Structure formats: structure tokens, C-alpha cells
Amino acid sequence: MPQTFAEKILAKKAGLKKTVPGQIVEITPDVALSHDNTAPIYGIFKRMGGQRVFDPGMHAIFIDHAAPAPTTAHAENHRIIREFVAEQGIEHFFDVGRGICHQVLVEEGLALPGEVVLGSDSHTPHAGVMGAFGAGIGRSEMASIWAVGQLWLRVPESMKIIVQGKLDPGVTSKDLALKIIGDLGADGALYMSVEWHGEAIQHLSLSQRATLPNMMAEMGAKNSFIPPDEKALEFLEGRAQRPFDVILPDPDAHYTQTHTYQAAEVEPMIACPHTVNNVKPLSAVAGTHIDQAFLGTCTNGRLEDLAAAAEVLTGHTVARGTRMIVIPASSQVYRQALQAGYLETFLNAGAVIESPGCGPCMGNHMGVPAVGEVSISTANRNFRGRMGTKESEVYLASPAVVAASAVAGAITHPKDL
């Protein structure tokens, strides 16, 4: 029986010949990811009677959501995490400044083809850029994995997205993701496995590809998968933490839904307040005043994203009365951007550069907006209150558009500067 990626990988992990959508399977993940919520998970783990975690080598723990600590309460949370990591002998621990969990997991060769990554973060599908099954789970579920090493999952139905052709210059995978979310809705892939196929996907760099599975959390997906090709395998040479086996869907597998897009028809898109699926062409909202521009996050804080923004900012300055905040997704990206001269470009333009981490994306620190202010961001969410106050507005866009908007003080296409 032909199998989709999700059906095939979950069958393998459960020791079965095949699975079908809706079937319940018990698996042991290859990677269990947690971040600042490790401290409350530890509390649940202890209440369960847990003493030692199952396989310390399986866990990857990050401090990234509120890092460095903006309050004493956050600092205490970080202390608990560090004590837990030392007590349990966790091998893969990434402290303040190392970067955002999803980005660093890929950089460190911990997100691998044919493996299962379960994380206590809704954007864990990001790992699908490397051909892994990445899925977000709850805190009690993660505590259970710590205790017994297993978790049950319902095999998801699968959606196939085919993107033909090639994106036009100036159009990015962020625009493609927003276009699809706008078309299919915030629940368009609810508890589904979203697979990406077509020549347009193959043309994309790994950095551009990563935005796609990351954004599928905003469509309700359980996981999202891009078939690993030579680009992915070359990236993993000398980087992969262990041997892996690529798992691909069968050519004649059955998909609950199939959607085909022509890449050349995609234009720069904007997600407008207050939902990610409130998507409009850039041309429809051009000229909208902004107070702040934010470049970063696990969605678009990689070197290629910073390069696109730096190109726009060269020879320009951030508009008077507008703030621009730049946060590289990891220390590796920060270092590479420094060497490439991008950070100097940002500084010359009047932007503020912060240490790697999530920053204001979820309203913790490093540039949360004031009441009544408008932000444009490269992040993945713009729910009311996402960046702090519920009395602000957040627009989502690609890195180049965010940079151009910072220069203009209003939502702007780079070509119009």
C-alpha cells in the first residue's frame, strides 16, 4: 500500500509495516526539544514521580524565548533549567545567546532526514526542512517523554502542495507561505502533514525552504515535510550528529488534499492584523504607517534574510520616528552577518541589533510596541497581543519589505524607495 511521508515514518518508528490516517501509534522520538518552558515541564515531570529522564542524549534544551533574562522571574526560570540540565546530564544544551531552538537544531545537525523531532513549541514543524517529522506537543506530553521515552500520536492525514515554475525576483518563500495560508485559512491543514513538492521548491535555498514548514503551524499543520535533496544532504555532510536514513513518500501515495500553485503568479504578500490568514497583496496596503520594523525570528532571521534586508538598507537610513530592530536567529548567523558587513550596514542605517533569540516576537522584551503602535515583522504570528499589548497592530512580511518599510516609515515595496 503506497504511503505518504507521515504514514511511512510513523510506521517505521512504531515498528509497523504500514499505518493509515487516524491510527494511534506509540513511538520514541529521536529528538525531544524544549526551551524556556523546560522549567514548568520539569515541575510536571516531578509531579509524575519522574527522577531521571529517559536517554539524556535524546534531549535538546534551549534558552531562547526570553534571553537574556528581562526580569528576575525569567532569570529564576533560567536557573532552574541550568540546574536540571546539570542534574540530568543533558548533552545538547544551548544557553542564552546561542539562538532560537529551531534554527540551532538545524545548524547543529540534530534535525535529520527520516527522524522524528517532538518539541514543546508549536513551530517544531520547522525541522521538516531537513526531511524530519517535526511536531509540536504539550508540556505534559513532553514530561511523559522525559519519564518513559514514548508518546502516542494519531497518524495525520496528508496534504500535498505542488509549486511549479520559479518565484520571480523579489518574491520569497514568505510570500508563498502567506499566499497559501490566505487561500486555505488558519485551519486549512488542521492536524495534517503538509508535504511540499515541485520544481519551485527545489529551486529554493535551504534558508528559503525553512520558512515554509515553519509557517505551516499557522495553518494548523501537525508537521510539514520537504523531501531532502542534494542541497540538504550536502548541508549535513560533516554536520549530522548521527547516521540517518532518508524517508520519502511513495509516488502514488494518497493525499486527502492536493493544491497546485504557479510560482510566477505569487507576488509580495502581507499578513494584516490580527490573523495570519488575513493576507493581502503588498500593493493593497502600501503606504500604511508603521512605528517599528522587526527583522528576525525562526521564520526569517537567517543569513540570507539579513542579506536581503542589508541590500535594501545600503545607502538609506531608517525613517525619523521609526525604529528598526534586528535580531539574528543564532550566534552563527550573527557571526556570519558580522563578517559579511551586514551588521555595519544595519548600524549605519540606524537599526538596533540585539543578541540572538526570539526577542519581541512573543512580547517578552527587546522591542515590544507601545499601545496604539504599528509594527511590521518577519515573524510568523500577528495575533492580537502577540508582541505584548493587545492595543497594537502587527503586519507580517518578507525581510526586504520589512527593511524598505523601515526606510519609508510606511509599508513599502523595495523597488519604490
Model-derived features with residue positions:
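Fe-S-dependent hydro-lyases/dehydratases of central metabolism
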Residues: 1-417
